[in-house]
Amino acid sequence: MFMYPYIVADIGGTNARFALVTGKKGNAFNLEQIQILNGSEFPRLQDAMQHYIDTLGGEKPKAACVAIAGPIDGDNARMTNLNWEFSQAAVKAEFGFDKYDTLNDFGALAVATSSLQADNLIEIKAGTMDPKGNKAILGPGTGLGVAGLACAGDSWLPIPSEGGHVNVAPATQLECEVIRAAMAEHGHVSAETFISGPGLVRLYRALATVRGETPKNYEPKDITAGALDGTDDLCKETLDLFCSFIGSLSGNLALTYGAKGGVYLAGGVLPRFIDYFKSSDFVKRFSEKGVMSHYVENIPVNLISYEYTAFVGAAAWLDQL
């Protein structure tokens, strides 16, 4: 653990968000001086961070942790949708940090689940959380992020993955037909093919093929709107399938990670239709695991509703080092 304050950052494909962690009360971190920068205006991570530090005044923080939307390979970190690539050792040396670390964005979200407050969560499925049990997190957005979290003594260790790219698994005859239709158009059909913002459109088009209908030129928001207001049966059936696929995958991840500490949902898609989602077949599909249904029966599922979850994860990671 390092003396406060220290810097945390959440770097996406567009925005570079920074905050100063000034203390902690219980599991809740004090986040101050939050700034949102346009990442494309800076040639490097270091330039954006220096800009942020220049606005702080006072003594420069001695530690930082950055969550990025991109892969981390040893010392090298690379953004997926922003032209930034950097050496972690070089960042630490340039700013004279006593400690610097980089986490994958979903790794940071996973670590955050150990510190989120009750009012940061929306219950989707009731259950009993093992406070030291493994956790699983997934989130449909532009893509589908997946990660796990394991307890090691007094520390929490993120388990990054590319779980969004596993093969999608059907549970009904209709889903078999929908997957076949998607394979004809896309070839390989992964979980992300359907369970993401763009995936909602792919699912809609595949279902239209199965139903013998001509799909409209819809965006994800059009599909959710047509389902929510009841004006489009194909949109409603699409959204129902979307929720079912998420339920099956979430249950699979609960088994894969042994997630007795809970399953957490994130991303920008689900909050757009949270009431619909809660009344869908999500819980039913989560729980239908054959001879292992008893294993997932009491695992809770929560949707993360806190805007600064990645900050919390980065702060919690530094706090336990």
From Swiss-Prot:
Recorded hits in CDD domains, A to Z, give: ASKHA_NBD_GLK
Q: What is an annotated GO biological process for this record, any one?
A: glycolytic process
Q: Where in the cell is it found?
A: Cytoplasm
- Reactions it catalyzes: D-glucose + ATP = D-glucose 6-phosphate + ADP + H(+)
Task: Assign the protein's first listed, main location to one coarse class.
Answer: cytoplasm
Query: What are its E.C. numbers?
Result: 2.7.1.2
The family assignment reads: Belongs to the bacterial glucokinase family.
Alphabetized NCBIfam families for the sequence: glk, PRK12408.1
Query: HAMAP family, from UniProt?
Result: Glucokinase (MF_00524)
Q: What is this protein called?
A: Glucokinase
Q: Which organism is it from?
A: Saccharophagus degradans (strain 2-40 / ATCC 43961 / DSM 17024)
